[in-house]
Design a protein with these regions (language model features):
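The feature marks proteins involved in alpha-glucan
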Residues: 1-26, 30, 52, 56, ...
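Carbohydrate-binding surface patches
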Residues: 25-39, 538, 558-596
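C-terminal beta-strand-rich structural cap/linker in extracellular carbohydrate-active enzymes
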Residues: 35, 79-81, 614-634
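Conserved alpha/beta catalytic core and glycan-binding cleft of carbohydrate-active enzymes
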Residues: 114, 344-500, 507-509, 558, ...
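Substrate-binding/active-site clefts of carbohydrate-active enzymes
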Residues: 147-322, 332, 340-351, 355, ...
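Glycan-recognition and catalytic regions of carbohydrate-active enzymes
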Residues: 481, 485-498, 515, 519-580
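Active-site-adjacent beta-strand/loop module that shapes the phosphate/pyrophosphate-binding cleft
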Residues: 635-638, 693-695, 702-725, 733-741, ...
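Conserved N-terminal beta-strand and adjoining loop/helix that marks the start
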Residues: 635-650, 671
């Protein structure tokens, strides 16, 4: 029976490309349902969304139309009316919710006809992604469950466990530290990734205090979850409150990412499309068993044309109607690459900045067609622009997921340096481009990072565990790709187990386990960790070389550096105007590391991180136990100048008053342009600024100097004028002076060592 759905004949006959669902206008509502195997279809209209209420208003017979669709119209303003479909297949009639319902009543049984624009928040028409135009590698993604943010009393958020909890500002702990939205904004992340917020199963929305669930149990894909709304009974409320939440995020400079679960449904037999077209939505074997690569009881047959259309339509709807800025796909590897590419293409037609990423684990599934390619990690080249979570960096840093007490790099395990280097460079073994690699050390699955460290280093003091946590964060936050962190990681989130230990699968554990414990921020050690995360994020944002988008750029700019210690890795990263030197030491002892020649500014060390310079060092540095040390320096801009002699005097110039270091004296010259030799640059500059031709002779000396606004390498040449008389075309004044007269003029700081050398070598005049 099910094989026919994947046949070419069935797809050619019944693939429909138009709009489906209920389309409201003040004058009438038009309905269209895809039900190619149905013998009869009707619409039931209800006064309320309560499935137990006896409030039927009317029943309308639908008429068969093109490509297996059924249509009907109802004149009059139906805004706020609820509806279902009665579908008869093979003599059995079922009442089902519209797969394209935009909202529902309580528990998602009855769809609701809604004037969607009527619930838009103010300025919704001008609402936009605050990070539009940026690369996904510029993102820092923060994974958050709607309920976790606000359910703890210490959050002091009024709308606990609700969409509106994410709109509240000014909330603080008793100690005065920001909570909720203010905390997220201050952290510096760019994208808030919300765990599933469409209508999901398991949770009874009618309860005053609904059961907790992560939400990976899809029921109505295009409907917001009612348990997160202040009123789950009236379908307009959940729609309005999601829009208010997204608007609040955008107004605070945060993009919104939606976690979507198209790879399986909560109950395959009860799912609306499988009720309307029995078995069509799912992969079912010839013996009638559901494929179960998802380990959730069923797998979605995305390779079928109308399943693919449904998924594409659904994602586009959330991007269009709710202004979602990104989508994270749960077990994307069960969805075929054609569908993934069609989703991205369709969304990007209107919203070119929307980001896409997901899980690419290789899961077994029973495909309904031959030759289908799935969106697994190793097929990243087939889905350009789609990112995948890197389980490699996760397991190397914290220990393999399949052995709960096995330590990782940060807890002192000896791991492959080559593997760590590959992680830092964005996993070239499977990520076609670095922007397809999502780096993380914790997410909602498994234990939190701090809990995992406690399991793998049970005898380590708390201070050492915090160091391990921070080392992991520094490594993944500075790696090429897209950094991703679980909400609360920045304040050492923990999930205590019911009978001791830790909860490693809290998908339906109570708020007491899952909520963010804001009160911990009133303790200094937690504030220190939070400050460290803020500094890491700020540092990443400040350095474009940590956010490269192409494999060629990574190969050109990122260079592993040999470290003898087996617990230490280091990297040198080239920037357009500077360099970064990063050392990650997981040893319990300090490690000495030789720096490349020159002076380096320390930006990250021990428990401190940021963009400010802590100190300037050179030569060899000592990297503290279990810590990262990151140093930077700006590349010197090549500057050339002339020691232009006329008998026993040389020429000096006074800088214009309106320029940096205005009215200070200097030697004539300027910046070297691309393709020029130093003598050529000096000759050009002196012609432009002095109107003279130079005979450039031997080099006198070279110095480096760091100004607040520029780092220069200045090379000085002996010269004489071969043609012309110097004119102050760009300078304030010119002077010919004896070497012994330099103390009568205030020179630019970069010239200090040059003046000393002139005085030492010549002391008096120097005729040429």
């Amino acid at each position: 029976m099910y094989e026919q759905y994947s046949s070419q004949e069935f797809e050619e006959k019944y693939t429909y490309s138009g709009n489906l669902g209920a389309f409201w206008t003040p004058e009438k509502t038009t309905f269209r349902l895809w039900a190619p195997t149905a013998g009869a279809v009707s619409i039931r209209l209800y006064r309320s969304g309560d499935p137990g209420a006896d409030d039927l208003l009317a029943q309308l017979r639908m008429q068969p139309d093109v490509c297996g669709t059924w249509t009907a119209e109802r004149f009059g303003n139906l805004n706020g009316i609820y509806y279902t479909y009665l579908v008869t297949v093979d003599g059995q009639t079922r009442e089902v919710c519209d797969p394209y319902a935009r909202t529902t009543g309580v528990n998602g049984c009855r769809g609701m006809i809604l004037d969607l624009a009527s619930v838009n928040p103010p300025q919704w028409d001008t609402d936009a992604d605050p990070h539009a135009g940026k690369s996904i590698t510029d993102a820092v993604i923060y994974e958050l469950h709607v309920r976790d943010l606000s359910s703890a009393p210490s959050a002091h958020i009024a709308h606990k466990g609700k969409f509106l909890g994410l709109t509240e500002t000014g909330t603080k702990t008793r100690g005065g530290h920001p909570t909720g939205l203010d905390h997220i904004k201050a952290l510096g992340i760019t994208h808030v990734h919300l765990l599933p917020m469409y209508d999901f199963g398991f949770t009874d929305e009618s309860r005053r205090h609904p059961q907790y669930n992560w939400g990976y149990d899809p029921v109505n894909y295009n409907v917001p979850e009612g348990s997160y709304a202040t009123d789950p009974f009236h379908g307009a409320v959940r729609v309005a409150e999601v829009k208010q939440m997204v608007k609040a995020l955008h107004d605070n400079g945060l993009s919104a990412v939606m976690d979507v679960v198209y790879n399986h449904v909560y109950d395959a037999g009860a799912f609306c499309i499988n009720q309307i077209v029995p078995g069509y939505f799912s992969r079912i074997s010839s013996d009638g068993k559901y494929s179960n690569g998802s380990f959730c009881g069923n797998d979605t047959a995305s390779e079928r044309s109308m399943v693919r259309k449904y998924i594409v339509d659904s994602v586009c709807y959330w991007a269009d109607e709710y202004h979602m800025d990104g989508f994270r796909f749960d077990i994307a590897s069960l969805i075929d690459t054609v569908t993934i590419n069609e989703i991205m293409a369709a969304v990007h037609q209107k919203h070119p900045n929307v980001i896409f990423y997901g899980e690419g684990w290789d899961m077994r599934t029973e495909l309904t067609k031959p030759g289908v390619q799935l969106a697994v990690q190793t097929n990243s080249a087939m889905v350009p622009g789609f990112g995948f979570f890197s389980d490699t960096i996760r397991d190397l840093l914290r220990g393999t997921t399949f052995e709960s007490t096995a330590p990782g790099f940060v807890a002192g395990a000896v791991v492959s340096k080559e593997a760590l280097e590959a992680c830092f460079m964005g996993m070239p073994s499977w990520a076609a481009q670095p922007d397809q690699c999502v780096n993380y050390a914790s997410c909602h699955d498994n234990t939190t990072l701090f809990d995992r460290i406690a399991l793998t280093a049970p005898d380590a003091p708390v201070e050492s565990r915090i160091r391990m946590n921070n080392l992991a964060a520094a490594f993944y936050m500075l790696s090429q790709g897209v950094p991703f962190l679980q909400a609360g990681e920045e304040m050492l989130r923990t999930k205590p187990g019911k009978h001791g230990g830790f909860d490693d699968n809290s998908y339906r554990s109570p708020d007491s386990v899952n909520s963010l414990k804001w009160a911990t921020l009133d303790k200094p050690e937690y504030q220190d960790v939070l400050s460290y995360y803020k500094g890491l994020i700020a540092f990443r944002k400040a350095h474009v070389a940590l956010r490269l988008s192409t494999r060629e750029d990574v190969q050109r700019c990122v260079h592993p550096v040999y470290c003898e210690n087996e617990h230490c890795v280091a990297f040198r990263i080239d920037e357009p105007e500077g360099e970064i030197f990063a050392v990650f030491n997981a040893d319990a002892q300090p490690v000495s590391v030789s720096l490349p020649d020159g002076h380096w500014n320390v930006n990250i060390r021990d428990s401190r991180a940021g963009t400010e310079t802590m100190e300037t060092v050179s030569g060899t540095v000592s990297v503290s136990p279990i810590s990262a040390m990151v140093l930077t320096r700006r590349k010197a801009i090549e500057v050339v100048a002339g020691l232009i002699w006329d008998k026993d005097k040389f020429l000096i110039c006074q800088r214009p008053e309106n320029k940096a270091r205005g009215l200070l004296w200097e030697f004539p010259g300027g910046k070297v342009e691309a393709g020029e030799t130093l003598p050529q640059a000096l000759q050009r500059e002196c012609m432009e600024e002095l109107a003279v031709k130079l005979d450039v002779r031997d080099r006198f000396m070279q110095v480096e100097h760091k100004y607040p606004d520029i780092f220069i390498r200045l090379t000085l040449f002996h010269c004489v004028i071969s043609e012309g008389v110097p004119q102050a075309l760009e300078h304030n004044a010119l002077r010919w002076i004896h070497p012994c007269e330099t103390k009568n003029f205030t020179f630019c700081p970069a010239d200090a060592d040059i003046l000393k050398e002139i005085d030492r070598v010549y002391g008096g005049s120097k005729p040429l």
